[in-house]
Amino acid sequence: MQDRQKAQDYRALLLADTPLIDVRAPIEFEQGAMPGAINLPLMMDDERAAVGTCYKRQGADAALALGHRLVCGDIRQQRLEAWKAAYQRFPNGYLCCARGGQRSHIVQRWLKETGIDCPLIEGGYKALRQTAIQATWQLAQKPILLIGGCTGSGKTQLVRQQPNGVDLEGLARHRGSSFGRTLNPQLSQASFENKLAVELLKINAHQTLKRWVLEDEGRTIGANHLPECLRERMAQAPIAVVEDPFALRLERLREEYFIRMHHDFTHAYGDEAGWQAYSEYLHHGLFAIRRRLGLQRFAELTDTLDRALAEQLSSGSTDGHMAWLVPLLNEYYDPMYRYQLEKKAANIVFRGTWQDVANWLKEQ
């Protein structure tokens, strides 16, 4: 194996966005994969399951023989062509299986028979995964500054503008609230953690890093939860709180949740299906917090939402949404965040408008 494939180079592979031809079964890939990996399995889920059962009952030799019988002829040729095409597309890529074992070696051998010498990852995905976990733990020990503030304060934008800012919500593909989902589905927990680790490694490699700047998040962002090592550090971190006028927050929320989300849904699905998806998205966000609102208040706000959607559909105006958004902020989101922030009052080091906080960050 070349030096670049040895254990001490795993971080370099991740930092370089090295393309990975991941030959694990789809179910394994879905449970966790590295950024930049493409899944071109040696065996599909049912084939892998059959080989696993055979291994338990009859041993390694019988399982290997079964694998070769399952992946032969046209099936073998089709998969081989896919690996060849992937290598031609990514000539600096690597083969990767679970542990750098038989699957990646078999694919490597088959490719070599066609004249392609494709390297593989020693230790496989599990070695890269351990590297990602260790990197997150190590880099989370650096000082952290949190950006706090009520919904609509522009916290994410502020974080993105910092050279040492890490957009946790962007990595999670979710904006944190019940209305936070995007058109891109969230990654599995392991894939989210891997993506976060690579982002930390990249920023650390390219910045003179005094500290991380992160948004003040809870334990979870949608379906993804923050690594405990990072969460523990965030719980003790100083906080700069954005306190913008309510009207300005409303305009940010109008742009983000009504104008942009409507545009994104219709762009992705067309006018009719996109409108339906947009409507369902807003209804789902409200439905998700119905118990906290109380069923009567939930029903009232749902009626108001329906009227606002009808107005938006007929005239294009999003003004009607303010009739349910304003009480939702006043009665639910703002009191909830202020309660959470009060428990961390000792950690607050600065308060001011969005621009005040932006200027303060430049001076630090």
From Swiss-Prot:
PANTHER family the record matches: TRNA 2-SELENOURIDINE SYNTHASE
Q: Which SMART domains match?
A: RHOD (SM00450)
Name by which UniProt lists this protein:
tRNA 2-selenouridine synthase
Q: Which PROSITE patterns match?
A: RHODANESE_3 (PS50206)
User: Recorded GO terms, molecular function?
Assistant: transferase activity, transferring alkyl or aryl (other than methyl) groups; tRNA 2-selenouridine synthase activity
- Cite the Rhodanese domain residue spans from the record: 14-137
What keywords sit in the KW lines? Answer: Selenium, Transferase
Q: Source species, please?
A: Salmonella paratyphi A (strain AKU_12601)
Provide the top EC class: transferase
Active-site residues, Swiss-Prot/TrEMBL = C97 (s-selanylcysteine intermediate)
Q: Which domain of life is it from?
A: Bacteria
Gene this protein is translated from:
selU
The record's function comment reads:
Involved in the post-transcriptional modification of the uridine at the wobble position (U34) of tRNA(Lys), tRNA(Glu) and tRNA(Gln). Catalyzes the conversion of 2-thiouridine (S2U-RNA) to 2-selenouridine (Se2U-RNA). Acts in a two-step process involving geranylation of 2-thiouridine (S2U) to S-geranyl-2-thiouridine (geS2U) and subsequent selenation of the latter derivative to 2-selenouridine (Se2U) in the tRNA chain.
Q: Which InterPro entries match?
A: Rhodanese-like_dom, Rhodanese-like_dom_sf, SelU
Q: Which GO terms describe its biological process?
A: tRNA wobble uridine modification
Look up keyword Cytoplasm and say if it applies.
no
Q: How does this polypeptide assemble, per the annotation?
A: Monomer.
